[in-house]
UniProtKB/Swiss-Prot annotation:
One Pfam family cited in the UniProt record for this chain: MinE
GO biological process: cell division; regulation of division septum assembly
Name of this chain's protein: Cell division topological specificity factor
Keyword Cell division among UniProt keywords: yes
NCBIfam families the UniProt entry points to: minE
């Protein structure tokens, strides 16, 4: 019986992962945003932020997701960035 639970949990987890991936694909499609475009945005963000701080580019995570608008709860695309900062640069302030 424990073996059955193990496999059913695995398929449930795989199902959830597949569901989340499908949601992400749909968000990208509805926002009319290709992976190449997202990479261009990521490169531009790195260039701008690097003027002000040293960042961990390997830990950088930029993705397109969806969120709800406050005034009408409509689902809209959102650009979410997690940018690990190594240190702030001295800009002569």
């Amino acid at each position: 019986m424990d073996l059955w639970k193990f496999f059913s949990k695995e398929s449930s987890t795989s199902k959830n992962v597949a569901k989340e991936r499908l949601k992400l694909v749909l968000v990208h499609d509805r926002a009319n945003c290709s992976p190449d475009f997202l990479e261009m945005v990521k490169g531009d963000i790195i260039k701008v932020i690097s003027d002000y701080m040293e960042i961990d580019e390997d830990g950088l995570d930029i993705r397109l997701t969806k969120t709800k608008r406050e005034y009408d709860d409509a689902s809209i695309p959102a650009l979410v960035a997690n940018i690990p900062i190594k240190k702030m640069k001295d800009r002569g302030r």
